[in-house]
């Protein structure tokens, strides 16, 4: 029988796995309990990661101890309002686009925040921070109040949230965001999306992760239905996704929060990250179509040079930022600077823009980075004494449509 049967609301009460055989689910649906058997189970349970936790595959990524707090707000100011334009003329003329219908990011030392307009005029505002670098207030009132107080240490947050009120029924906190599964598939089960792993919401990599993992899951299932041998396919699937997760984390995210609030370092990394993303994964998918989604990022040998390049400049920028932190020199190049760039496209000419970013990296190394050449990279320190207020006027605001 073709098609799909949707049960809603429903919850999984029990899972019985039989690799190579039929998998059995016990479901609670309304007032009834139902048992369903199938050759394959696809776990798309998100952060609940039902199968990874049940099988003991779930692991916390201790190298990336981020946390997040967020809420829905009323009364957030309009980024494009006449009030702000008259009060801050340079702010109003900095961009040609409309900020208020875009997702805006306000960034500081060890943290970043999102500002997402919602239907009806409300705004989702939240922060993500590295717990080794930022001490988020824990015992100073309601979570929404603490979130507002934290953001109001930044001049943009202070202006935008001056008259805003959080929705008390829609305030959230999540600790230790990053995790992964040590196994991504077996003969009869496959994990997709956040059920397989999560790194960081910055750059929204979850959209890529679900695209690659769901496409590869569908290919596994159809291969089995065609009668193909599964052992090597499943082994390769697990190998590819484990390598992809680790490479994605090490290249883009490991210790990135160390330099996130440094305009020169972060704006250079942003250009390189974005340009290489279009030059690599995006162009690959446009070239090969759906087949390009069957192999996750950084799992092919030809992608390893790009991985090493991205990991290298990310490590270097983190090390330079640590040296600045020790010298109490964070944010010294930030005042009056903003990172506003045209987006990349698939045009070959856009790849030339990468040379400018690479030249900027070289300049940073020659003028400052050389002081840490040959030094062993240090681990990110425990929570810094540098607060959001200390670098409030020396942080970067980024907005994109």
Language-model features and meaning:
Residues 67-68, 77-78, 177, 263-267:
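Alpha-helix boundary/capping detector
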Residues 109-113, 117, 131-220, 224-253:
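FAD/FMN-dependent oxidoreductases across multiple families
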Residues 220-396, 400:
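C-terminal helical "tail/cap" subdomain of flavin- and related membrane-associated enzymes
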Residues 66, 72, 107, 166, ...:
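Intrinsically disordered, low-complexity regions enriched in Ser/Pro/Gly/Gln/His and often acidic
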Residues 2-157:
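Predominantly flavin-linked oxidoreductase catalytic cores and closely associated redox partners
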Residues 36-37, 41, 90-101, 188-198, ...:
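Short, surface-exposed, charge-dense and proline/glycine-enriched linear segments
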Residues 86-92, 161-163, 173-174, 236-238, ...:
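A general structural signal for short secondary-structure boundary/capping elements
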